[in-house]
């Protein structure tokens, strides 16, 4: 395709792999770049050629002709050179250029910034969480109120999300807060921070309004015409003849809006302080914003320009102590533009700002910086000038304006880019896996159920460490999606050699993979099989729930059916000796009945017999049939009675605990205080996170960086009814804090897919925006059920014996959904740590991807609290959709390594190089349970014992840790405590310098 010659000046073709072809785009004027020679003369330099390079380092062949609204220089990576962010309107992509220090620019790598605003209006920079890294904020036009959103249309084109695609940079109609990770990449955290929606926003500025040491955010809003008004668009669309542009604009209402002040409360959390600070008290069309100290009191005031109205000056009345800084630079840079100023006060985090000129939307601020000092007398100011030299002022007085002259600067100072000096605990060893990539064939979930919030066809894979060939080294086994094959990556002491299962590619997804001893020796791999993509209920009933892959001579044989087909597709599997006969029994968790989400599905327990078969357990069938839609499951002895209890994570329900009384299960969720913590839980594991000898529960959910929010008093609800052939009717609802009514969260066009008469009943988008759930459902309102979530936080449930206490994991861990979760002592300090596998991309088409995670390592403090490791501290960066995660010491060095699977992308391996070496425990169990599944281990040091660890098969989101357990080994360790399934205990002495110990169960 090509544009006809007559139109090439107005239009261009853009290649869009995400749309499977090319699109026509309107051209704007090209952006202009001018170099100052220092003598008052500027020379235009084309934004192409050798000075401007693309992400791969190739020169731009043509100058960008995007609809640019703002451009701003700021040194984002601390190398002393000004980088450049260019804000582009409509669907033109923003351009983020890094300066090479020689005046050349290169676009940031594709994966450095995963999501941006769609119609970017302005940009500003600040270190919002005071971690010494520069964060980036851009504005767009998403309304903060549900009612306004429901009567407007979106400006961005909803794009299909391809399986495994991570390198594209999606654009979404919302503000973006790019939170710097410190490794040259950013995590989009606007929802997480509470800054995603400020209305039709133009200028924005970071400024510490209340002088508490954290920069707050001011955003100005409004537009002459609300051209996103859906009713206006419909009126124009129904007109038979063309409408002149000036009359067309008259179809749209004026959009006057209040400007917004967002107070930075720390920890990447902003709250609306507009009313408290008397900012934006009236509705107007405000576009420009600038900062200056108009009254000389050392606090920055604000000037806002408005369309068709006089400008407004807001006087800052904060009385908190501060210092103001102006710079006198060497000619010709007399204002010291590009210099970085840092203020350190004893009771506040270090504050840094760069002296900049212009760059706001059609605006620029005065060259004065203001910093909080609290009541400290110890205040230092340092300036790193553009040429690298430094000026230092020690123990300055508060409440003063300091003008600092470059003439007194000292020799060149190092760049200020913050670095974590500690060596990362992990290094990337993925290359050892031979390039294994998870395969997941595309499936259109939304044809069958149009109102699904997320795809259910891209939930895998799980990953397990299993010694498949019996050579003493644990191998990696990864599930597959339809069209792929079960992957066995054999550990050959230095690299992993892939072995493929025999037969054709899998017809259905293989979920959890677990080992059981085969009759006559060897291993059988049990694989959960999902029938979710079956074309009909009848077809689903021909899909075996569990397959068995016998392993012969290191190679897997053809699969055989282990468990009969069921109506529900399978997700999690878990193994334990539930009835005390010495054989491992199998729990099969129901994920969903195809086409009926979120209706519950029955799970099942299969007992193993002495001849190696699995038979359905009837004693617990009724109890297991009502557990709901299970995302994950594991067995663990929570009460220390020697019998494995069952813990399950469900969608739209609590984490449930079923107590095992000699093979009979009883749901004790309510008794343990867990019933009120409902969520769309994903993964779960257990670990002794406070070192008290009791296993705690860790459950992953969707985090705090999505459009969803929930609390006990305002749950996020799903109203469910029966809509016939297209599955259950779904209405996502939440109580509106303003009206007190339960309001639908879905836009009218989407909800109308399931309620055909809704358009007629509503009559207009404006009317629909005011309708409650009962009004939307009409006569069907009484024939519905409600399920809900009270939290979306990843949560630690501390075991107190007769109850569990809920504690949200650190806020930094909530920046993305998590699935896989591993509890292990990664640093070897004797305190259990956690790892979370993060991200979820296959949301419904109009919802952004949830991909701000990179895999989160949490170092345990030993009391149930954690330190969230940065990417530099952990060494882990997994930017795709993490699913299963499992730990093992694959190279036998006494450190816990990590394997993480990704949906539709490469399986990753992380080698632990910095943890303290621990004790490797090899259990030799009975014939029916050779790995000792269910055994608990603790290190004994005099009268003290370390955290308890249990050998388990299943959990961690469809996964299994290695059975060779690594325990931290303190210098005074004397013995290993082992409690086998059913409660028999052993104390095994540890010799000085011993690093491996073998414990054999009594025969």
State where each predicted segment sits.
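Short, conserved, GDST-rich strand-edge loop motifs in beta-rich repeat architectures
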Residues: 1-26, 143-169, 223-254, 528-542, ...
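Beta-rich catalytic cores
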Residues: 29, 67, 92, 119-121, ...
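Surface-exposed loop and turn segments in beta-propeller and other repeat-based domains
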Residues: 46-62, 110-113, 191-194, 275-280, ...
């Amino acid at each position: 395709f090509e544009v006809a010659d007559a139109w090439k000046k107005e239009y261009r073709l853009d290649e869009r792999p995400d749309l499977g072809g090319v699109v026509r785009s309107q051209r704007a004027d090209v952006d202009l770049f001018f170099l100052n020679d220092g003598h008052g003369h500027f020379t235009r330099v084309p934004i192409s050629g050798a000075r401007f390079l693309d992400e791969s380092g190739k020169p731009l062949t043509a100058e960008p002709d995007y609809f640019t609204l703002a451009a701003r220089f700021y040194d984002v990576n601390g190398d002393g050179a000004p980088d450049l962010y260019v804000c582009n309107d409509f669907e033109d992509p923003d351009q983020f250029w890094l300066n090479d220090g020689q005046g050349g620019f290169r676009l940031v790598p594709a994966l450095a910034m995963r999501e941006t605003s769609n119609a970017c209006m302005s940009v500003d920079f600040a270190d919002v969480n005071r971690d010494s890294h520069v964060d980036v904020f851009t504005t767009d036009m998403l309304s903060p109120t549900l009612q306004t959103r429901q009567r407007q249309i979106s400006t961005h084109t909803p794009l299909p999300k391809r399986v495994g695609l991570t390198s594209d940079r999606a654009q979404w109609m919302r503000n973006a807060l790019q939170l710097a990770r410190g490794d040259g990449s950013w995590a989009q955290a606007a929802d997480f921070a509470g800054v995603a929606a400020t209305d039709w926003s133009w200028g924005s500025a970071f400024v510490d309004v209340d002088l508490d040491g954290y920069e707050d955010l001011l955003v100005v809003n409004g537009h002459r015409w609300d051209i996103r008004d859906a009713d206006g668009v419909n009126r124009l669309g129904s007109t038979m003849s063309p409408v002149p542009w000036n009359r067309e604009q008259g179809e749209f209402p004026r959009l006057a809006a209040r400007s917004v002040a967002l107070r930075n409360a720390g920890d990447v959390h902003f709250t609306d302080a507009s009313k408290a600070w008397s900012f934006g008290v009236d509705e107007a069309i405000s576009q420009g914003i600038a900062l200056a100290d108009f009254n000389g009191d050392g606090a920055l005031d604000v000037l806002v320009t408005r369309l068709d109205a006089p400008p407004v000056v807001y006087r800052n009345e904060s009385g908190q102590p501060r210092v103001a800084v102006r710079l006198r630079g060497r000619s010709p840079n007399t204002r010291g533009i590009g210099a970085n100023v840092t203020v350190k006060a004893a009771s506040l985090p270090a504050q840094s700002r760069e002296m900049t000129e212009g760059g706001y939307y059609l605006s620029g601020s005065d060259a004065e910086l203001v910093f909080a000092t609290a009541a400290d007398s110890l205040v230092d100011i340092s300036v790193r000038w553009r040429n690298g030299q430094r000026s230092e002022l020690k123990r300055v007085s508060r409440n003063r304006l300091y003008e600092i002259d470059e003439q007194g600067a000292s020799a060149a100072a190092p760049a200020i880019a913050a670095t974590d000096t500690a060596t990362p605990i992990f290094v990337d060893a993925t290359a050892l896996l031979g390039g294994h990539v998870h395969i997941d064939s595309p499936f259109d979930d939304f044809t069958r159920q149009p109102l699904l919030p997320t795809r259910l066809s891209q939930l895998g894979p799980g990953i397990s460490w299993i010694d498949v060939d019996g050579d003493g080294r644990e191998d990696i086994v990864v599930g597959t999606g339809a069209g792929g094959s079960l992957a066995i990556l054999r550990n050959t002491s230095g690299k992993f050699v892939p072995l493929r299962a025999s037969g054709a590619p899998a017809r259905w997804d293989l979920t959890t993979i677990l080992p059981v001893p085969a009759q006559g020796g060897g291993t059988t791999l049990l694989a959960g099989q999902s029938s979710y993509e079956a074309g009909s209920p009848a077809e689903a009933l021909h899909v075996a729930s569990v397959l068995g892959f016998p392993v012969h001579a290191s190679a897997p044989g053809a699969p055989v059916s282990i468990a009969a087909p069921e109506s529900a597709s399978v997700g999690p599997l878990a193994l334990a000796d539930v009835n005390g006969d010495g054989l491992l029994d199998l729990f099969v968790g129901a994920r969903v009945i195809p086409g009926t989400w979120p209706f519950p599905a029955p799970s099942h327990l299969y007992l193993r017999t002495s001849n190696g078969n699995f038979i359905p357990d009837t004693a617990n069938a009724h109890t297991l049939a009502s557990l709901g839609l299970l995302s994950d499951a594991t067995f663990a002895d929570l009460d220390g009675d020697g019998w494995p209890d069952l813990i399950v994570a469900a969608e739209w329900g609590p984490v449930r605990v079923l107590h095992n009384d000699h093979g009979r299960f009883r749901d004790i969720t309510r008794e343990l205080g867990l019933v009120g913590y409902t969520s769309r839980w994903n993964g779960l594991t257990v670990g002794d996170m406070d070192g008290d000898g009791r296993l705690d529960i860790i459950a992953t959910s969707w985090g705090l960086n999505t459009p969803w929010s929930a609390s006990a008093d305002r749950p996020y609800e799903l109203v469910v009814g029966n809509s016939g052939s297209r599955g259950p009717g779904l209405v996502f609802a939440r109580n509106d804090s303003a009206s007190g009514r339960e309001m639908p969260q879905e836009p009218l066009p989407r909800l109308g897919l399931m309620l055909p008469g809704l358009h007629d009943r509503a009559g207009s988008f404006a009317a629909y925006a005011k309708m409650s759930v009962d009004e939307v459902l009409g006569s069907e309102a009484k024939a519905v059920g409600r399920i809900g979530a009270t939290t979306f936080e990843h949560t630690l449930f501390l075991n107190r014996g007769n109850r569990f206490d809920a504690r949200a994991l650190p806020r930094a861990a909530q920046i993305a959904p998590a699935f896989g979760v591993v509890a292990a002592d990664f640093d070897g300090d004797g305190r259990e740590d956690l790892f979370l596998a993060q991200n979820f991309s296959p949301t419904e088409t109009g919802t952004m991807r949830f991909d701000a995670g990179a895999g989160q390592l949490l170092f345990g403090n030993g009391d149930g609290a954690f330190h969230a490791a940065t990417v530099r501290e952990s060494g882990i960066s997994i930017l795709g959709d993490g699913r299963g995660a499992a730990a093992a010491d694959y190279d036998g060095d006494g450190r816990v390594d990590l394997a993480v699977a990704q949906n539709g992308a490469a399986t990753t391996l992380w080698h632990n190089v910095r943890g303290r070496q621990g004790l490797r425990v090899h259990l030799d169990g009975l014939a029916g349970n050779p790995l000792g599944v269910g055994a608990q281990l603790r290190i004994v040091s005099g009268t003290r014992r370390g955290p308890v660890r249990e050998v388990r098969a299943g959990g961690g989101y469809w996964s299994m840790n290695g059975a060779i357990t690594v325990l931290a080994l303190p210098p005074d360790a004397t013995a290993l405590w082992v409690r086998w399934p059913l409660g028999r205990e052993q104390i095994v002495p540890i010799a000085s310098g011993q690093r491996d110990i073998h414990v054999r169960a009594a025969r």
